[in-house]
Regions:
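Local cysteine-cluster metal-coordination motifs and their immediate loop/turn environment
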Residues: 9, 23-27, 65-77, 107-117
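A short acidic/small-residue loop/turn micro-motif
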Residues: 5, 29-32, 120
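Membrane-interface junctions of multi-pass transporters
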Residues: 29-71
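Recognition helices and adjacent regulatory flanks at domain boundaries
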Residues: 68-98, 108-110, 131
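Conserved C-terminal portion of the radical SAM core fold
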Residues: 18-19, 204, 224-228, 246-388
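Short, basic/aromatic recognition patches
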Residues: 1-9
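Core AdoMet radical
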Residues: 97-107, 118-154, 167-183, 195-213, ...
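Short, intrinsically disordered, charge-biased short linear motifs at domain edges
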Residues: 12-15, 51-62, 96-103
Length: 389
């Protein structure tokens, strides 16, 4: 009988960050980041047998709550359904690498407010000008950034290594940067079709929605394709959160997605941070008004910590919780997830230093981008002391 801390991801999953380092899943927090292996330098098999993963497997089998899984424990303790619980339901015991997800470098065409140069090439100059110039000379900074896409360059040893594991993989998950911009990702899908593996593989994407790929014909060969559009606001609020994106273009691409037939499912991936959580009722209202045929998933920003919705002051927390509880109970699908979000906030501990960082970061990047949080989010700006007098 499996223990109550058992997780399939410890045994049959790898999640690759933009720099090619891996962990068992995207929620895991490494306890020894300096010892991480890098894709392209060490094989996938070596990554699966990393010493830290060996300890995690032992803890999963003996009922120990491994500290690297803190994000799932926090969500479960708040009443939410964590990735651990969801994945345990979806997958039975398997052999080899079953679940592979990757943030495919930092190639991207927009500059999301909660992102950074490591995950978006569009952030590179702004990151240096506002922060990294204090740490690096420009030449050293460029060298530092290179490691956040090196593993996923076309000539990387990682790609043939991944090809050798396609026969056991049941689920591929691609993030960015912007995953639709990766040429090698499309080559991997074509190879899976050629080898006859595609019919047993599900593929999931999180996209910023600014592009709709020309290569969608390859999708029909796979067991299932799911595309989640990252929607962190509506209209001008979306464009603030997803800087350089155009809300009308994203709406047009969501309309295109509706014309695809067969095995494609579409959804909204709503990522909640201190910047936008107050406006979740408006986001949900737009979702049910215009996209009720889509799925939806509420995601949390765990880091950088100043964006984490568990650290807000008590007075702000009360106002936000009242807003979330005002969302109509008739929105049943959302209410299957909302209790976990509410519990996460309720169980959080205010962090005044991080909250001050949050407010300061808004000002720094507003100045750099010539944006104005108070103009786009006036109600919440007033609550947190950023409104114009």
């Amino acid at each position: 009988m499996k223990s109550n801390t058992w997780c399939i991801n410890a045994f049959h999953s790898l999640s690759a960050s933009n720099d090619g380092t891996t962990r068992p899943c995207c929620m895991y927090v490494s306890q020894d980041p300096d010892s991480k292996y890098i894709l392209g330098e060490k094989t996938i098999e070596e990554h699966l047998n990393h010493p830290e993963l060996q300890q995690l497997k032992k803890d999963c089998e003996t009922g120990v709550r491994n500290t690297g899984c803190i994000r799932c424990w926090e969500e479960e303790d708040g009443g939410g359904k964590s990735k651990r619980l969801r994945d345990n339901e979806r997958y039975n015991q398997q052999q080899g690498l079953v679940y592979f997800e990757a943030s495919l470098g930092n190639q991207c065409n927009i500059r999301c407010r909660t992102c950074n140069p490591h995950s978006s090439s569009q952030w590179v100059d702004e990151g240096y000008d506002t922060q990294y110039h204090k740490i690096y000379a420009i030449k050293d900074y460029r060298s530092h950034i290179k490691k956040f896409y090196k593993s996923f360059e076309e000539e990387s040893n990682f790609w043939p290594d991944l090809e050798s594991h396609l026969h056991t993989i049941k689920h591929l998950e691609f993030y960015g940067g912007e995953p639709f911009m990766s040429k090698k990702m499309w080559s991997i899908l074509e190879l899976a079709v050629e080898k006859g593996y595609a019919k047993d593989i599900e593929v999931h994407y999180a996209t910023n929605g600014t592009l709709w790929p020309k290569q969608v014909e390859v999708w029909k060969h796979f067991k299932r394709i799911s595309v989640h559009f990252s929607i962190d606001g509506v209209g001008k609020q979306f464009e603030y959160m997803r800087y350089l994106a155009d809300w009308e273009v994203v709406q047009a691409n969501m309309a295109k997605s509706r014309t695809q037939e067969g095995n494609l499912t579409i959804g909204w991936f709503i990522t909640l941070s201190n910047l936008n959580v107050y406006y979740l009722p408006e986001i949900i209202e737009e979702y049910y008004r215009a996209y009720p045929d889509f799925g939806s998933f509420l995601n949390l920003v765990h880091g950088p910590r100043h964006f984490n919705i568990s650290i807000m002051p008590e007075d702000v927390k009360k106002i936000v919780l009242d807003r979330l509880n005002s969302i109509p109970k008739s929105y049943r699908h959302v209410w299957t997830q909302l209790p976990g979000i509410i519990g996460f906030i309720e169980n959080g501990t205010p962090d005044p230093a991080m909250w001050d960082t949050f407010l300061e970061e808004i000002k720094i990047h507003d100045d750099y981008r010539k944006q104005d949080y108070a103009e786009v989010f006036p109600e919440f700006a007033k609550i947190i002391g950023l409104a114009h007098d």
